[in-house]
Amino acid sequence: MICYKQQSLQFPITTVCPGEKNCYKKQWSGHRGTIIERGCGCPSVKKGIEINCCTTDKCNR
């Protein structure tokens, strides 16, 4: 699986995720505006955080 990886204001890069079957994109509102995080897997999130998990290469753009 190849996913985009990103922490808030950084530019997204691609990464290989051995053994993973999902990529995710999660976003929430913070004091600086909308915060976006991308990565491998499909983590659990707290209330108020939107998450989209997907199952194809680079699907979390």
From Swiss-Prot:
InterPro entries: Snake_3FTx (IPR003571), Snake_toxin-like_sf (IPR045860), Snake_toxin_con_site (IPR018354), Toxin_cobra-type (IPR054131)
Alphabetized PROSITE patterns for the sequence: SNAKE_TOXIN
GO cellular component entries: extracellular region
Pfam families: Toxin_cobra-type (PF21947)
Disulfide bond annotation, renumbered to this chain: C3-C23, C17-C40, C42-C53, C54-C59
SUPFAM superfamilies membership: Snake toxin-like (SSF57302)
Tissue: Expressed by the venom gland.
GO molecular-function terms, A-Z: acetylcholine receptor inhibitor activity; ion channel regulator activity; toxin activity
This protein's UniProt keywords: Acetylcholine receptor inhibiting toxin, Disulfide bond, Ion channel impairing toxin, Neurotoxin, Postsynaptic neurotoxin, Secreted, Toxin
Record's subcellular location: Secreted
Family the UniProt entry places it in: Belongs to the three-finger toxin family. Short-chain subfamily. Type I alpha-neurotoxin sub-subfamily.
Functional summary from the UniProt entry: Binds to muscle nicotinic acetylcholine receptor (nAChR) and inhibit acetylcholine from binding to the receptor, thereby impairing neuromuscular transmission.
Protein name: Short neurotoxin 3
Organism whose genome encodes this protein: Naja annulifera
